[in-house]
Every structure is written in C-alpha cells, then in structure tokens.
C-alpha cells in the first residue's frame, strides 16, 4: 500500500550559487558522510548536490513531514546499485518516523537535464 508520494524539482544553478557562497559547509548540511566522499570526487558537484537535494526533499514529502519532527537531510542516504538504480537508506529520527508509519519499501527515480534536477519517491507499507 502506498503510504506517501513525494516529488521535487530544483534548478541546478540555484544549488551552484549556494555552493559558491558556502561550498563544503552547504554540502555538509545536505549530505551524509558517505555521500560527502562521493561529492568531493564527482566531476559535476553541482549536479550531484542538486540531485541529492531533490531526492531528500521528495523523501520528506513522501513521509508527510517535510523537514520537521526531527527529519533532516543527513539522515537520508542516497546510494546506487551496481547497475545505477538509486536506493534510499534512512538513519536516525528519519528512520524512526518511517518505521512508525509502517514504511517498508522505497522507490525512487532521480534525473537531471541541463538546468534542472528532479526526484520522485514512493513510500510503501505491506498492508
């Protein structure tokens, strides 16, 4: 059963401008430690960060909380399978809230094209 759906669209230039002002400080606010390592090595860091921003905003919307009740960017880790399929891992208070809602499965799609990054998330329970 679908518990929540979330989507987010972000302009990559907006993220690039924030990075210019605060670069790694801004990235540390958005990325979990594992993601930060990949960010530092990425050839297009503004796209990497924009896609993570969109994904995490979409997750918060699927939870129905936004970034309240202890939900935070760094409790959301966006990884990938060997084939490139994006995966969601939650930790901390964000994971607790997902568990309370009965969420057992996440589906996520992330994409970017020229000026924008977009993410779409579905949160599901068994019943």
Curated annotation (Swiss-Prot):
Catalysed reaction equations from the record: apo-[ACP] + CoA = holo-[ACP] + adenosine 3',5'-bisphosphate + H(+)
Keywords for the protein's UniProt record, in alphabetical order: Cytoplasm, Fatty acid biosynthesis, Fatty acid metabolism, Lipid biosynthesis, Lipid metabolism, Magnesium, Metal-binding, Transferase
Any single GO CC term annotated in Swiss-Prot or TrEMBL for this entry: cytoplasm
Co-factor requirement: Mg(2+)
Function: Transfers the 4'-phosphopantetheine moiety from coenzyme A to a Ser of acyl-carrier-protein.
Pfam families per the UniProt record, alphabetical: ACPS
A biological-process GO annotation: fatty acid biosynthetic process
Main location: cytoplasm
Protein name (database record): Holo-[acyl-carrier-protein] synthase
Membership in a protein family: Belongs to the P-Pant transferase superfamily. AcpS family.
Record organism: Hydrogenovibrio crunogenus (strain DSM 25203 / XCL-2) (Thiomicrospira crunogena)
Enzyme Commission identifier(s): 2.7.8.7
Domain of life: Bacteria
Residues that hold Mg(2+) according to the record: 8, 57
GO molecular function, one term: holo-[acyl-carrier-protein] synthase activity
Annotated gene: acpS
């Amino acid at each position: 059963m679908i518990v929540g759906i979330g989507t987010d669209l972000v302009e990559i230039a907006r993220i690039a401008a924030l990075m210019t002002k605060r670069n790694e400080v801004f990235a540390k606010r958005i990325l979990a430690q594992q993601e930060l390592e990949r960010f530092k090595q990425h050839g297009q860091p503004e796209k990497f960060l924009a896609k993570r921003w969109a994904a995490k905003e979409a997750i918060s919307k699927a939870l129905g909380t936004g970034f309240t009740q202890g939900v935070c960017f760094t409790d959301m880790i966006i990884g990938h399978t060997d084939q490139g399929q994006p995966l969601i891992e939650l930790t901390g208070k964000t994971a607790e809230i997902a568990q309370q809602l009965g969420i057992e499965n996440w589906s996520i799609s992330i994409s970017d094209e020229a000026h924008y990054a977009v993410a779409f998330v579905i949160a599901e329970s068994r019943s």
